[in-house]
Design a protein with these regions (language model features):
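Specific pore-lining/lateral-gate transmembrane helices of multi-pass inner-membrane transport
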Residues: 1-79
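Residue-level recognition of pore/gate-forming positions within transmembrane alpha-helices
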Residues: 17, 21, 53, 79-84, ...
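Membrane-embedded alpha-helical segments of multi-pass transporters/permeases
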Residues: 21-29, 87, 91-92, 114-122, ...
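Alpha-helical transmembrane segments
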Residues: 62-70, 118-132
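Membrane-proximal transmembrane or re-entrant/amphipathic helices at the cytosolic face
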Residues: 148-192
Length: 192
C-alpha cells in the first residue's frame, strides 16, 4: 500500500522541517553574520518566511494525489488561488507594511494552498496522514520556539546554551517517539 509510504514521508518531512526551523531560529544570532549588518532589521521575517516555506513543502508533498489520478489541473487551480491571495495581500498591505506584508503574504498563500490541497485531496484520493503526530510536533516546536525566544537572556553564550538545551529536548522527543535508534544495527547498541 503506497499510501502508507506517502503518509510516512509526510510525517518525517514535517519532523525534520520543524527541526531545521528550530535550529535556524535558535542560532539566528550566529547565522546573521552570514549577511551584512544592513540586513539585520530584516531578520524578523525569517520565522514567517520559514513557516511559509514549510507549508509550501507540505503542499508539495500533498500534491502527489492529483498527479496519481491524472488531474494535474488541480495544481493550476491551487497555484492561481495562491497567486491571487499573495498579490492581494501585497497590494493591500504592502504600501503600509513593506516587506513584512510580503512575508505574511507568502505565509498565508502557502498555508491556503496546503489546506486546499489537503481537503480536496482527501475527497479525490484519500491518504490517511498522521495528523495527530503532525499537530503534536507543531505544538512541541511552538512551545520550544516561544520558550527560546520569549526569555530575555542578555548573555549571548547563555542564550545559545539555553536554546541548545531546548533543541536537545526536541531531538530527544523526536528520537524517543519516532526514530527507533535501538533498531539500527551499529547505533542501536548505545540505545538499549
Amino acid at each position: 500500500d503506497n499510501t502508507k509510504a506517502y503518509s510516512e514521508a509526510m510525517k518525517y518531512f514535517i519532523i525534520f522541517a520543524l527541526f531545521i526551523f528550530l535550529g535556524v531560529m535558535f542560532y539566528i544570532d550566529i547565522l546573521k553574520y552570514f549577511v551584512g549588518p544592513a540586513y539585520y532589521p530584516g531578520l524578523r521575517v525569517v520565522p514567517i518566511v520559514m513557516l511559509g516555506e514549510l507549508f509550501f513543502g507540505i503542499y508539495f508533498n500533498l500534491s502527489l494525489w492529483y498527479k496519481l489520478i491524472d488531474q494535474t489541473r488541480w495544481g493550476a487551480y491551487f497555484s492561481t488561488i495562491g497567486c491571487v491571495a499573495t498579490v492581494s495581500i501585497i497590494l493591500l498591505f504592502g504600501p503600509s507594511y513593506g516587506y513584512m506584508a510580503c512575508a505574511w503574504a507568502s505565509f498565508f498563500c502557502n498555508l491556503l494552498m496546503m489546506l486546499l490541497s489537503y481537503f480536496v485531496g482527501q475527497k479525490k484520493f484519500p491518504i490517511e496522514y498522521d495528523l495527530k503526530s503532525a499537530f503534536l510536533y507543531f505544538g512541541v516546536a511552538t512551545v520550544l520556539y516561544v520558550a527560546g525566544m520569549a526569555l530575555p537572556i542578555q548573555s549571548e553564550w547563555l542564550r545559545l546554551g539555553y536554546r541548545t538545551i531546548l533543541l536537545g529536548v526536541f531531538i530527544a522527543f523526536m528520537v524517543k517517539r519516532d526514530l527507533p535508534l535501538r533498531e539500527l544495527p551499529y547505533v542501536g547498541r548505545f540505545f538499549r
